[in-house]
Amino acid sequence: MIDIGANLAHESFDLDREAVFSRAWGAGVQAIILTGSCRQSNRAVQQLRLTAPDRLYCTAGVHPHHASDWTDEDAELITSLAAHAGLVSLGECGLDYHRDLSPREVQRKVFIAQLELAIRLEKPVFLHQRSAHDDFHAIVREYRAALPDACVH
């Protein structure tokens, strides 16, 4: 069993992160994929992964909530992190119109930028969609044939 979407780099886990890992291993989880969702967490999951490199893997991307923060630095960081063996996917990226924490047009542009980056880096994508089905589907349909693989939640 693999947990594919663990946001364990978040500060809310600082006091009990090791206990969370211990319970997961005890329950039969064989590997955990730590989710990167912004510049800070992308760096954090890479460092956290090194504490158990045989069981912890990570993603790097910019969640739609953080799309307004996207800069060229994010693309450069994701490209750099993609060279590490433990980075198994780009994301979490996509569209989230439920809260609209970033403007929808910005979300779409950043989503497309990350899909194009995943294609160039030949990495699968970990996708997020909430209350944005039509736009999400249209964008994914345009890029799907070129993407190495994808997981949607």
Regions found by a protein language model. Give the residues of each.
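Mid-domain alpha/beta scaffold segments of enzyme catalytic cores
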Residues: M1-V152
